[in-house]
Amino acid sequence: MNDQSGTAQLRFLEETAIRLRQNGFTVEPIEDYHLPVCWEKGRLCRISGKGSVLYRQENVDSVRTQDALQSVIDTAKMTSEYMAILEYAPQLKATGLTGDYRILADFGDAVLAGHPTERGVQFVTWEWDFDRKGVHHGHYFQEDYDAAKRDFTVRSGLVQKDALFEPEQLAQIYHALSFVREQDESLSFGRDQELAELMEQVGGLLPTDALRQRDAPEQSSMTMK
């Protein structure tokens, strides 16, 4: 591992540790490019500097621990996404703007920026001035990366606002599909599979921890230790 790769992995793990603490997890000191994660006074898993989540089967033997593990996986995936972009993102230079803001996405009249702080990366969207030398009308999302991305797609014109579902709406759709699958005894096997696939697609659009009830996570998405 070269020094640049090692430094990037440490930054990812440090940022992930901040996010996990904000979500109620306990983390131990980083050791050998791995971040130990604890939940309810017990070791839950480890996150590698490359983003893999490693766990022991006996540590996730209940629905609650499986949900907690899925939350860690979602957090690691999200953090890995924006930290990889941030690593090579250009500085946002705008008249009157001070501080370390880096361009994560830039399209049309809108820009999405990340701002590294001691409390983790903070996210904001702006609209460019007509000459693209300044920005205005900032929407600040603190650590909510998913919300910042949704706002950017609308402000940039990539997606019309009416075409987007809010997380609460998606969660309601997910639970409605789950209710139909559980209660409708007349469902054919094929129709049930179609609804299961639709639930998976809807669940994939939801931000971390948006669902309070979910199926046990697929082990195929995790790395066994």
Where are the regions that the model predicts?
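Short Lys/Arg-enriched alpha/beta "domain-start" segment
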Residues: 1-27
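A short, exposed loop/beta-hairpin motif centered on an aromatic-Gly-Thr core
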Residues: 5, 58-64, 133-146, 160-162
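Long, continuous compositionally biased terminal/linker segments
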Residues: 39-68, 75, 81
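Short aromatic-glycine-(Arg/Gly/Cys) micro-motifs in beta-strand/loop hairpins
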Residues: 49, 112-138
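Short, structured interface segments
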Residues: 72-84, 144-160
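Short N-terminal "domain-start" leader segments
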Residues: 82-122
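Charged/polar low-complexity intrinsically disordered segments, enriched in acidic residues
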Residues: 161-212
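Non-Sec secretion/translocation targeting segments of pathogen effectors
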Residues: 217-225
